[in-house]
């Protein structure tokens, strides 16, 4: 050891200087277990600076949030529109249902409060009971069974189709949904007309059946199925796209039939979507007024659904108080239907 080497070792061992050692107390070992710290170097040597520590994320950093006045400002326009166009008419209709308000006469100028008389009158009216049953039949067969059944069938058959064929069929189905109801009703009146109607022309022989008079309820059911199937098909198509292709391929390889695949794989997977679609279709069909454009509620009240019944007593007879009471009853029925669907959906989620 030279004198210079000894002087450097003594300087490194002086107070304030750490001398790195290896695991055996000797010279530092680069590959040893201990960490090597840089030694202060004299002139002519290169010092190794210690790496700067990375800044730690501040757990208490402020998160950008919208204050309450700003949030209210964003929500206020939507709430205002809902209040003006939905809440106020509903409350006003409920108020009118408790009065004898009419379009003309003394009741129009000075309506009187009659309490629940209008509701009792509606429940005792045989035409109201008949309209309620017609509405439930119309909703069940044209909405739940017809639209959902045909919509799911089309979505299942077209799920693997690609190219212009699928696009053409989808356009044709969706056109029946986006065309205005008045135009569709005019087309169906021409289709079902007894003299020169398209349907009678397609049937062999000299057929002159007045379908809107002979089978009015069946006519509006088929009309509504044709009209609303596209909506159900779009919803079911989106639901089927969520199925993993491997599940269907496994069922195919194992030799499962189409019904077994639907029963054991498809239906359990899209049951939530089916309940949601059933709720939307049911409530939409229950409040539908379009059959009035086909039959006007006739013949002999055979197609008078509740929406047409309210129109007849409210606008036809000018009895706004009674018509508003029937509207409130329809609102309650809609709420009951919605609660039943929500209850079934909640029970399914609990079981799953």
Protein language model features and the residues they cover:
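A structural signal for multi-pass alpha-helical bundles of membrane permease subunits
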Residues: 67-352
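Transmembrane alpha-helical segments of polytopic membrane transport and secretion proteins
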Residues: 1-76, 163-167, 342-352
């Amino acid at each position: 050891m030279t004198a210079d080497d000894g002087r450097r070792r003594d300087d490194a061992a002086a107070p304030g200087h750490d001398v790195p050692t290896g695991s055996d107390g000797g010279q530092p070992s680069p590959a040893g277990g201990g960490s090597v710290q840089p030694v202060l170097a004299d002139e002519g040597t290169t010092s190794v600076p210690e790496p700067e520590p990375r800044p730690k994320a501040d757990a208490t950093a402020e998160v950008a949030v919208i204050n309450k006045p700003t949030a209210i400002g964003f929500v206020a326009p939507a709430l205002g529109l809902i209040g003006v166009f939905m809440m106020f008419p509903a409350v006003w209709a409920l108020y009118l249902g408790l009065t004898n308000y009419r379009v003309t006469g003394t009741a129009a100028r000075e309506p009187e409060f009659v309490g629940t008389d209008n509701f009792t009158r509606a429940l005792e009216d045989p035409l109201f009971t008949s309209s309620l049953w017609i509405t439930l039949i119309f909703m069940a067969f044209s909405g739940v069974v017809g639209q959902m059944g045909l919509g799911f069938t089309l979505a299942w058959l077209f799920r693997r189709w690609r190219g212009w064929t699928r696009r053409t069929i989808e356009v044709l189905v969706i056109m029946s949904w986006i065309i205005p109801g008045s135009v569709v009703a005019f087309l169906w009146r021409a289709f079902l007309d007894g003299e020169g109607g398209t349907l009678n022309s397609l049937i062999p022989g000299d057929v002159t059946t007045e379908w809107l008079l002979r089978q009015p309820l069946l006519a509006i059911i088929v009309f509504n199925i044709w009209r609303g199937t596209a909506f159900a098909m779009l919803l079911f198509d989106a639901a089927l796209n969520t199925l993993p292709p491997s599940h269907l391929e496994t069922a195919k390889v194992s030799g499962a039939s189409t019904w077994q695949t639907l029963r054991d794989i498809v239906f359990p997977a899209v049951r939530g979507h089916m309940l949601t679609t059933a709720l939307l279709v049911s409530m939409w069909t229950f409040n539908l007024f379009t059959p009035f454009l086909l039959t006007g509620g006739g013949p002999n009240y055979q197609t008078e659904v509740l929406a047409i019944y309210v129109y007849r007593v409210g606008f036809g007879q000018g009895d706004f108080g009674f018509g508003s009471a029937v509207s409130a009853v329809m609102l309650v029925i809609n709420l009951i239907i919605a609660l039943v669907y929500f209850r079934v959906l909640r029970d399914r989620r609990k079981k799953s």
